[in-house]
């Protein structure tokens, strides 16, 4: 028999009780810690997908990258309700489409900051610069007065005549946006008109419309693509190269135009006649109030704003008119009553109620900008939900406009604006301290261009092709997918003062 002291099994069995507690304690602690985190996150009072030990944030951010911001917001609100918690880049993010909550965010200074990828915003020049996505509240406050002054007062009145003139001039040279088969690229036409009007009021130098419009489109694509990308994306140079080049291309073009403006200002005799938006910025730089980078980015953002959003909005309006000729008839009767045979003037604007309601209903039914992105600067409570400092906020105003108040929320109908609509239920431009600084001039521009166009155009639809047939991409904003036949129209002369606009199918 083997002595007990020499039996190797004795050593093995005696070691197991001593080693097991030491080996399992860290594992047990880790499991308990993860369980506590999981249990804490899962019991959040805010509806939304679960945290699931970090898997939830990865999935939600991935959904934004895959579906686009607008589509992802609609998905989460439809799935979980009108106040939803998700994550973007690991940061807690609330998606809100409830009017009372949206009103609270817009109203308070606590939400004047934006959010987005730092590296992405740096690439396009918007990080702590310009006005659109400047997430430095102190610097944004210094920049905003330049935009406010340019977009109000005398500039607001001048823009009406500029829009009328530009629309007429561009209708007289449709061949520049006409294809070989005679179809007109109406979206490109609207972009050219918007760029021309912006240039005449804010910059005032000669430019190549076709080239700049293309550069603006590429810049917007880069902005939309990079806004929420994770940092690792920017470490792979071949992935972001084309976006960096697109941003650099437009910024370089703007630098050249601004230098032309500087040269022009140095030779004029009376500065008062040339004190536009760009001039104010240049003189602010000369005083040391702004840097050259500030000036370049502010001019760039002023020049891209209308071609980026208002052009698509007007394009959609033409499609909606084509789908419902009775709407055109109502507007034409009002236009003839208010204006007669003359062109639209500033005094006419308050009297064009049907035209105004049509614009509002178009923006409600098919918004181009249907979300607003903000960041909480301090802890807060919104409709009973706690909001921590640094929380991202996305206001899904496009969905909000179809949930409350309107009698026919899912239809395009002028009846939705026959009665006065309380501001809390309809905010296409936002309001409050960070509301759209150009909302008043935007309405003036859309009215002036639409009225001038309708006085010369009749809009008809062929083969029942409507807005629902057009493929759209809903990311940072809603844009029709380019290069599809339904984006083209045929303009044929019908009478001396009117042109027929016919939407066609190339197939």
Curated annotation (Swiss-Prot):
Coiled-coil segments on the chain, per record: none
Keyword Aminoacyl-tRNA synthetase found: no
Database matches in InterPro entries: Cyt_P450, Cyt_P450_CS, Cyt_P450_E_grp-I, Cyt_P450_sf, Cytochrome_P450_Monoox
One GO cellular component term noted in the UniProt record for this chain: endoplasmic reticulum
Binding site for heme: 436
Keywords, alphabetical: Heme, Iron, Lipid metabolism, Membrane, Metal-binding, Monooxygenase, Oxidoreductase
The keyword Lipid biosynthesis is assigned to this record: no
A Pfam family per the record: p450
Family: Belongs to the cytochrome P450 family.
Protein name in the entry: Aromatase
Organism: Gallus gallus
Gene assigned in the entry: CYP19A1
């Amino acid at each position: 028999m083997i002595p007990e002291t020499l039996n190797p099994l004795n050593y093995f069995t005696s070691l197991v009780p001593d080693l097991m507690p030491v080996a399992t304690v860290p594992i047990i602690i880790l499991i308990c810690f993860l369980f506590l985190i999981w249990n804490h996150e899962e019991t959040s009072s805010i509806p939304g997908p679960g945290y699931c030990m970090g898997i939830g944030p990865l999935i939600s951010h991935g959904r934004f990258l895959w579906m686009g911001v607008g589509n992802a917001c609609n998905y989460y609100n439809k799935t979980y309700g009108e106040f939803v918690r998700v994550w973007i880049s690991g940061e807690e993010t609330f998606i809100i489409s409830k009017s009372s909550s949206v009103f609270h965010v817009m109203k308070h200074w606590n939400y004047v900051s934006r959010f987005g990828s730092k590296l992405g915003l740096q690439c396009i020049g918007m990080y702590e610069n310009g006005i659109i996505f400047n997430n430095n509240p102190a610097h944004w406050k210094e920049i905003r007065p330049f935009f406010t002054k340019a977009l109000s007062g005398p500039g607001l009145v001048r823009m009406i005549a500029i829009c009328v003139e530009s629309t007429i001039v561009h209708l007289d040279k449709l061949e520049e946006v006409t294809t070989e088969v005679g179809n007109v690229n109406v979206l490109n036409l609207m972009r050219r008109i918007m760029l021309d009007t912006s240039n005449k009021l804010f910059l005032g130098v000669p430019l190549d419309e076709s080239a700049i419009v293309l550069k603006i489109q590429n810049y917007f694509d880069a902005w939309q693509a990079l806004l929420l990308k994770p940092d690792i994306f920017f470490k792979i140079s071949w992935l972001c190269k084309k976006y960096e080049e697109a941003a650099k291309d437009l910024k370089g073009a703007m630098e050249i135009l601004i230098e032309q403006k500087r040269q022009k200002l140095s030779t004029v005799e009376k500065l008062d006649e040339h004190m536009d938006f760009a001039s104010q910025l240049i003189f602010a730089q000369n005083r040391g109030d702004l840097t050259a980078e500030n000036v370049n980015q502010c001019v760039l953002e002023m020049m891209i704003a209308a071609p980026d959003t208002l052009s698509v909005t007007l394009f959609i309006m033409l499609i909606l008119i084509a789908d419902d000729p009775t709407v055109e008839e109502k507007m034409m009767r009002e236009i003839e009553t208010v204006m007669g045979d003359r062109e639209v003037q500033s005094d006419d604007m308050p009297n064009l109620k049907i035209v105004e309601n049509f614009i509002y209903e178009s923006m409600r039914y098919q918004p181009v900008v249907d979300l607003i992105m903000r960041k909480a600067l301090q802890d807060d409570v919104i409709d009973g939900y706690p909001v921590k400092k640094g929380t991202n906020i996305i206001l899904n105003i496009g969905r909000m406009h179809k949930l409350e108040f309107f009698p026919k929320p899912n239809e395009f109908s002028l009846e939705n604006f026959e009665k006065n609509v309380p501001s809390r239920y309809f905010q296409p431009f936002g309001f409050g301290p960070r509301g759209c600084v150009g909302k008043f001039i935007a309405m003036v521009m859309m009215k002036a261009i639409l009225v001038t166009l309708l006085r010369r155009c009749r809009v008809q639809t062929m083969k029942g092709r409507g807005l629902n047939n057009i493929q759209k991409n809903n990311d940072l904003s809603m844009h029709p997918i380019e290069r599809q036949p339904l984006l083209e129209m045929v303009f044929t002369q019908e009478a001396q003062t009117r042109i027929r606009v016919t939407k066609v199918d190339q197939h």
